[in-house]
Curated annotation (Swiss-Prot):
Listed pathway(s): Carbohydrate degradation; glycolysis; pyruvate from D-glyceraldehyde 3-phosphate: step 4/5
Molecular functions per Gene Ontology: magnesium ion binding; phosphopyruvate hydratase activity
Annotated protein name in UniProt: Enolase
Note describing how the cofactor binds: Binds a second Mg(2+) ion via substrate during catalysis.
Family: Belongs to the enolase family.
KW Metal-binding (keyword) present: yes
Length: 430
């Protein structure tokens, strides 16, 4: 074992780089006394919840105001001097010090993007110093569960310039024994879907997350296309491959009304609509079926559908333990979406996952629409045995990078590897 001093943080570098949408984001590199280092790049969302931690942006004319040099400077001028000399192995202390220096509830002083970049890079530096994979460093010897992928193959809403109000229509290939076969199934259906869209004269242009973005008349048309693509690829809907939705309902909600497909619906009417979809399609998961502050509606939704499908809170919970506790008390959902940049530190992310698990909620580890080549979430999904991951479609290399990382992890684990399959949708089975 190396001497403790070897794990002390020596220096931290940061720079402005680009994400998958061509927008600036923060990369941080943490160097330890022993010579090991770790790099992390933070993602950014398009449909962001009002309660998310604050990203620091420059404003002004450069990069249309989206530059992050101010966040980079915060790392160089404030975070690095404060953290140098701390043990990188004490992730909690590192993250706590950054949040204390920031001094705000939403990290608006230092910026969640600067804090998170350093937080994740610190963990990776520690793993590299110990010469172990990140999933093993963050997890334990039982961290061997590969997640079921929720593959966003039809994009709508804020993720695509088309007519669909719902943001994501996903494949859930669960009816196999390992991750690599699940990935193969999803890939074959993706190509089957592309062929179908071509045949129907529909666009095969892709959205932010690599899924197709055709102009369709309704969510039902999207669902029908997915069922046809699954069958055309030789698989059985519901038995081998199910469907999942991200309604991102906050995006079309205002003053108690959901403006959906040209109609004005109240919460009860929206719940009835979602219930019909569940009855007519093999849907196993609905994310953000209602708006982020429609707490009463969420409780009704959970009463109606909570014993039938996974109800995932994204904008509802924003990876925040306080909002999650409220949701647990009010029985508002049964699952939480985990996005590291919504809360801004690795420690708080792990706390949210643990609280969900203790409360009988599932957790779904997720990317953002503005992604990078960073593969931390792949390791995080295995480390925490979450059983599910959302990392986009089967195109765009920033999405594929996470799938490829999971393939490598499965190979490293060998016969110790387990695959969540259908079990990934129920925490009692993990």
């Amino acid at each position: 074992m190396k001497e403790t001093i070897d794990f002390l943080i020596d220096t931290i570098e940061a720079r402005q780089v680009l994400d998958s949408r061509g927008n600036p984001t923060v990369e941080a590199e943490v160097f330890l006394e022993c010579g090991a280092s770790g790099i992390a790049i933070v993602p950014s969302g398009a449909s962001t919840g009002a309660h998310e931690a604050h990203e620091l942006r420059d404003g002004g004319s450069k990069y249309m105001g989206k530059g992050v040099l101010s966040a980079v400077n915060k790392i160089h001028e404030t975070i690095s001097p404060a953290l140098c000399g701390l043990s990188a192995l004490d992730q909690t202390a590192v993250d706590k010090l950054m949040t204390e220096i920031d001094g705000t509830l939403n990290k608006s002083n230092l910026g969640a993007n600067s804090i998170l970049a350093v937080s994740l890079a610190t963990a990776r530096a520690s793993a590299n110093a110990l010469d172990i994979p990140l999933y093993r460093y963050l997890g334990d010897p039982l961290s061997n569960l590969l997640p079921v992928p929720l593959m966003n193959v039809i994009n709508g809403g804020a993720h695509a310039p088309n007519s669909l109000d719902f943001q994501e229509f996903m494949l859930v290939p669960h009816g196999v024994n390992n991750f690599s076969e699940s990935l193969r199934m999803g890939t074959e259906i993706f190509h089957s879907l592309k062929s179908l869209l071509d045949q129907k004269g529909l666009s095969t242009a892709v959205g932010d997350e690599g899924g197709f973005a055709p102009n369709l008349s309704s969510s039902e048309e999207a669902g029908d296309l997915l069922l046809e693509a699954i069958q055309k690829a030789g698989f059985k809907p519901g038995e081998q491959v199910s469907l999942a939705l991200d309604a991102a309902s906050t995006e079309f909600y205002n003053d108690g009304i959901y403006k959906y497909e040209g109609k004005s619906l109240n919460s009860s009417e929206m719940i009835s609509y979602l219930s019909r979809l569940v009855s007519n399609y093999p849907i196993v998961s609905i994310e953000d079926g209602l708006a982020e502050d429609d707490w009463e509606g969420w409780s009704e939704l959970n009463k109606e559908l909570g014993d039938k499908v996974q109800l995932v809170g994204d904008d509802l919970f924003v990876t925040n333990t306080e909002r999650l506790r409220k949701g647990i008390m009010e029985k508002s959902a049964n699952s939480i979406l985990i996005k590291v940049n919504q809360i801004g530190t690795l420690t708080e992310t792990l706390e949210a996952i643990e609280l969900a698990k203790m409360s009988g909620f599932t957790s779904v580890i997720s990317h953002r629409s503005g992604e990078t080549e960073d593969t931390t979430i792949a390791d995080l999904s295995v480390a925490t045995r979450s059983g599910q991951i959302k990392t986009g479609s089967l195109s765009r290399s920033e999405r594929i990078a996470k799938y490829n990382r999971l393939l490598k992890i499965e190979e490293e684990l060998g016969n110790q590897a387990r695959f969540a399959g259908a079990l990934g949708l129920g925490p009692k089975n993990i």
